[in-house]
């Protein structure tokens, strides 16, 4: 039995050992798993805490870090890792204050650093950055290496810095493959930066010193949609003809506050929607400037020198919704009759502002759409036959300043003794509307020193050569004056002429390149200026002006006469009053005045009732005449205790005042209650 038990015991011992070993191994593995889980949880919590930690000087809200307007000189180093937008504007941060660990914040996409103390383009920026605001700093250079560190950048704002053309490194934007918006307003640029990225959609270069735009300035910018060049030094002579025609996708072009005398040639027409040309010196617009601009919605020509517009200028503008024409010297003659009809026809769809007439005189200040009878005269003149009759019936201002000379941009004056002019001794009649002529001109003297010239060309011409000669002067001495006028013009104003002089005015059609048309004879007309001092001229001007023209002068004369008469009446009244006052002064007697009883209390002086009782009228005055006046005072003695005399002469000190003195020199008030 013992042996059997021992054997059984020996048999079960290994199995129990194996079971215990398995249990211990399982327990060890569970402990390791728990420790690993705990370590992982601690690391996760640490990362979460670190990512949500906000700098003490800032405010954080779902990835938006607000550290602006804090007076910081450097960016806080403990920026959360989940930050997406950093507001750091209006501080004093310089380039040394941008920490290197900022580029490790891979979630940051927008940084606002405007109005700080940066003098170089920052380099420690995260590669994930897509929008950067650096306005109102002192950044002077743009290096390729700086932009290469932020290849995903889409919007770059560098307004109000010190960037110049030479400080932009060549191919600085070569690595900016996604840049769509570039603002360089109010810097020191003298030309368009080169090497701009092809992805650019909006470019602002306003308020710089750009004076020249070469042909290749916008080469490759096929995606550009908005271009702003306001406030520069641009003139027509320094802009290449096809500069803007390459920008086929452009929808907005702004050339405000420049020195343009006419809109630039070959503007993009396919997709242009907004065209801003205000605040220039534009005096004429070629008739085909706005051709094929069927998408144009807004056109601003305010604050220029426009007096007229060519017929058909707006024919292709089917989508035009707003037309601004303020502050121009519009001359509302027959040449603008088409514009009046166009404004009336498109009144429901086009908002026209500022089309106010500055001449002729009788329509000054009127909106062109409200003019009726004045322009209807143009129809009457045309129906009576002959362009000469039309010129006679057309109302023209008597002031030469009302019409700005046309073609001034191309004007040149030269002495050409060999110019083909007819003999000055022949009396040349006014040109008539003969159908055989290719050019008909009409002249009309306006004032003693100006003549208005209008013409009509039967065939299109690139330009006209206009010449004039004062009779009595030989062409050999160089008195012929000429100018080149654009082919789309129909009128010209000669000024600074001699009064009471006869002029021969000739015009000839020019070919391309400003050469004379073969076998083309000049068309001439003769006109005589009025006498600047002649009474006949004055009478004629008054008759032409109508019966109402003399009213302002009559009003001025009548007002002056009435004013002189009023001064005479007032002078007579003043003289009479002065004389009457002297007579009354001599007869009137003035007496000394005595104060009322209440005046003592009002003046703060106590009355000695124990001594005097004064009775008298209210107010008396001291006489001017030396004779003695009657005494009007009644003095009653009340026998004071000291028995001193109460009578005082006129020479006694204090006589006539509110405070009397006794003979001993002691005031009465000191004895009032003794």
Swiss-Prot record:
The modification Phosphotyrosine is found at residues 600, 633, 671. Keywords: Cell adhesion, Cell junction, Cell membrane, Cell projection, Cytoplasm, Cytoplasmic vesicle, Developmental protein, Disulfide bond, Endoplasmic reticulum, Glycoprotein, Leucine-rich repeat, Membrane, Phosphoprotein, Repeat, Secreted, Signal, Transmembrane, Transmembrane helix. The keyword GTP-binding does not apply. It comes from Mus musculus (Mouse). One of its GO terms (cellular component) is focal adhesion. Residues 328-379 form the LRRCT domain. The keyword Signal applies. One of its GO terms (molecular function) is fibroblast growth factor receptor binding. This is Leucine-rich repeat transmembrane protein FLRT1. CDD domains: FN3. InterPro entries: Cys-rich_flank_reg_C, FN3_dom, FN3_sf, Ig-like_fold, Leu-rich_rpt, Leu-rich_rpt_typical-subtyp, LRR_dom_sf, LRRNT. Residues 54-80 form the LRRNT domain.
